[in-house]
């Protein structure tokens, strides 16, 4: 006889899918959603263009001064026209763009939010304070607002909008995590010691398996493949 899974386990699997093998209920019920390997361009308001990257979810969310949006998860490239006030919630903070034409790249993954201002200016409102960003600046926050602002390389930050991933001495763990966002199944690192190995390169997001093969060759790694899209690199 078949054994039914406890209801509590089913609920947990729906909210937090094991190995991230399928979207969560929260992501699937958002107003706009992309699956693995998909991208979506939308214009939900006049003078507002948004491009969602793979595994991204966006929903409408009102704020005190009007309509806004929430980046539930994933990454979005945003372009606003002059005269539009945009409130984009991401994690515990909110990105406000209300000072003319603005281009932003906002990423919300693994509990960490990264905001890059590519054109114009924007400010972050967070329970721990406010932070202003100008064109070419980037910051990150989670439950803490560090206030650290760094210079951003626009061509690298927005490379995904042109179908590429660009890394410059990024830890292998970070590269694998990014490949997993574009690939069905799951890539695992076989040795924890490899996690910090630096990686530099350009990879096409529409062929993540070619990226794995490139890593295997350039770093002299083993690559084992298993059913269900599971692969072990190490």
Model-predicted segments: where are they?
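A residue-level detector for the "anchor" residue at the start of short, highly conserved motifs
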Residues: 1-71, 77-234
């Amino acid at each position: 006889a078949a054994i039914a899974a406890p209801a509590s386990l089913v609920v947990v699997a729906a909210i937090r899918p094991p190995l991230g093998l399928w979207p969560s209920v929260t992501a699937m019920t958002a107003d706009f959603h992309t699956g693995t390997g998909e991208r979506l361009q939308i214009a939900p308001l006049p003078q507002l263009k948004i491009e969602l990257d793979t595994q991204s979810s966006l929903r409408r969310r009102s704020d005190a001064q009007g309509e806004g949006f929430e980046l539930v998860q994933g990454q979005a490239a945003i372009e606003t026209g002059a005269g539009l006030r945009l409130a984009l919630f991401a994690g515990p903070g909110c990105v406000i763009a209300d000072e003319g034409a603005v281009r932003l790249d906002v990423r919300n993954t693994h509990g960490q939010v990264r905001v890059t201002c590519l054109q114009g200016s924007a400010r972050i409102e967070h329970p721990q304070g406010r932070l202003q960003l100008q064109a070419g600046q980037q910051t990150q926050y989670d439950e803490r607002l560090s206030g650290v602002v760094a210079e951003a390389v626009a061509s690298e930050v927005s490379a995904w909008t042109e179908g590429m991933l660009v890394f410059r001495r990024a830890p292998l763990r970070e590269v694998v995590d990014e490949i997993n966002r574009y690939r069905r199944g799951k890539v695992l690192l076989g040795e924890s010691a490899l996690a910090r190995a630096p990686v530099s390169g350009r990879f096409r997001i529409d062929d993540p398996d070619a990226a794995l093969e490139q890593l295997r060759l350039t770093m002299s790694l083993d690559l084992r493949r298993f059913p269900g899209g599971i692969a072990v690199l190490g």
